[in-house]
């Protein structure tokens, strides 16, 4: 996973609340467990509507999604995060996230930045007044910049650290590789052990 420090990209104002994971990616697309190839499934039902925000040329290449409250509710599915990332989003801003979605996002390198709803409204106003406006999200400073507007966002220290370091679950484990190796070498042989996979 790549470290996340700052990101600048086109902001997309999604004026919808209670966006659940089935709206982010419908269940019909969950038949694969690979992490890529889900960009066409993102908001699939809504994108059939010509007036949907991502069908607007100004927002088609957006990478900072500014959504209404209660984003990512519903069932836990990593596919929702994969679809957002595959489309090109690096950041989702909302005043309230479902806990499971927020956790899945941090583990996959997608920043879920919590802003006050009043600040979300200000961001929407900027993005709708000047479609295609770039938004800069600074994880180190915990701020969002758009035009002359700067607003703070919240993220827990642990998730922030993981994103800054670019650590997914495997990366966290590999940081302890030497300790794990030492433990395995000193573990009594009569106890169960994990062996390398055999080819063929």
Swiss-Prot record:
Gene3D superfamilies: Aconitase, domain 4. It is an enzyme of class 4 (lyase). Catalyzes the isomerization between 2-isopropylmalate and 3-isopropylmalate, via the formation of 2-isopropylmaleate. It catalyses: (2R,3S)-3-isopropylmalate = (2S)-2-isopropylmalate. This is 3-isopropylmalate dehydratase small subunit. One of its GO terms (cellular component) is 3-isopropylmalate dehydratase complex. It comes from the Bacteria. Belongs to the LeuD family. LeuD type 1 subfamily.
